[in-house]
Amino acid sequence: MFIIELIKGIILGVVEGLTEFAPVSSTGHMILVDDMWLKSSEFLGSQSAFTFKIVIQLGSVFAAAWVFRERFLEILHIGKHKHVEGDNNQQRRSKPRRLNLLHVLVGMVPAGILGLLFDDFIEEHLFSVPTVMIGLFVGAIYMIIADKYSAKVKNPQTVDQINYFQAFVIGISQAVAMWPGFSRSGSTISTGVLMKLNHKAASDFTFIMAVPIMLAASGLSLLKHYQDIQITDIPFYILGFLAAFTVGLIAIKTFLHLINKIKLIPFAIYRIVLVIFIAILYFGFGIGKGI
């Protein structure tokens, strides 16, 4: 049984790594895979299972931090300073990157404030199957609207052309995505596209902005729940973290490589199908009623 439970922990880490930064809602997938199927709370205990999810989320966050490590060093003015591509070498030498630490901080402020104010309320009242289904569906519609709009934009901006107002508006959408199932990346990438960024630029800024705030949020959660960690559960935590980190690296790099080509609508369609599937399990078979 111990081996089977370890495999379950790895599966959850894989799911987290695949979905945390994709615009499909990691929360929705965790409800489907864990709460409705694997039920980690049954072999870890409810409190330890909650802490386990924080740990595997950290695995995904560290993966994103690694992918964007050079950009973070540039933003913090550590190491070599790169420049924006221009029409010639002189332009490249004279135009520094516009994305800086203030852009990231401006984007983090709305979610940071609302997170501190409403984190406990959201944790207690909004983590249910019906609310997650609502978030999945509404988020999918928002993504479709963003993609339809982006088709009309002739010269979408790169991440280094972002201004502070755009950063702030994208930050507000990150706060809206605190509703479980809405998807942080789905919300912020869509908003970035609506603010006339190209899909890759919106994705880059989404991940860069998300890493520090998610590290802070996960760190606070661990401080609140670290006492729930049992020594016997440590193998689950380690394997789950490593699975989320490894799969997260692959998923993030693949997503960033493809997003300008495939856009958001395929993910939106997938979300709607996922809502239908969860609804059938929940309303048709009563699976997940206790969540």
From Swiss-Prot:
Organism placement in taxonomy: Bacteria, Bacillati, Bacillota, Bacilli, Bacillales
One GO cellular component term noted in the UniProt record for this chain: plasma membrane
Gene giving rise to this polypeptide: uppP
Keyword Transport assigned: no
General function of this protein: Catalyzes the dephosphorylation of undecaprenyl diphosphate (UPP). Confers resistance to bacitracin.
Single Gene Ontology BP annotation: cell wall organization
Molecular function terms, GO-annotated: undecaprenyl-diphosphatase activity
Descriptive protein name: Undecaprenyl-diphosphatase
Family recorded in the similarity comment: Belongs to the UppP family.
Record's subcellular location: Cell membrane
